[in-house]
Amino acid sequence: MKAGRPAQRGQCAKRLSILEAAAAVFCREGFSGASIDEIAAEACVSRQTIYNHYREKETLFTAVVEDVMDRSNAALFSVLATFPDTADNLENELTAFAVRLNQSCLCNHDGKFLRKLVYSEGERYPHLFETWRQHGPGKVGSALAALFSRLAHKGVLAIDDLDLAARQFLALVNADLQMTVLFGETPSDDLLERTARNAVRTFLRAYGVQHPAPAEA
């Protein structure tokens, strides 16, 4: 039993090395331009070793997307846990949350990798991104809808369609940053804050509940 553990650790390390090398090559060359030989050279393994783990390039590509998605989702859901839960300073708190969300989705390495692949390969190989569509935007939208529901139940927001509101919020907070990130630039802190604040103000104009000021005695 114990004798098998070093071999298992070695296999795990080799698999991780292949995934990291494949991610780098796919990001650089795209799916169609990447070759197993190039991935093998980058991972310092043989071509046959890759085929021992993954039967074809498409299988390897799907494994890479799943691996990156797992890491990205772990970071993303830690951000979702910081969603504001009260009406106090809602604009400021939602703005800070939107900044953290964009830093996780758009500005980190995994987020950039996924978006680059989606833009470059999604149209030609839509089936390869089923995992991304189901477990990326879909999960985030559902989680946000549930979070907005809590604020709606407290009378802070007036939302009829929570799923639509969640999609609109996501569209607002990253729309102005998409091209910046697509061309390989990292948005400045000032741009992240301005974009988030404008998005939140627009969102609250649509869904925020305005309570009348108390009457003067």
Say what each PLM segment does.
Residues F83-P84, V99-L106, R115-E123, T202, ...:
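Helix-loop "lid/cap" segments that line or gate small-molecule binding pockets
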Residues E130, G138, A152-R201, H211-A217:
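Hydrophobic/aromatic-rich alpha-helical bundle segments in the mid-to-C-terminal region
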Residues N92, C107, F113, L117-Y119, ...:
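Amphipathic alpha-helical packing segments from all-alpha helical-bundle domains
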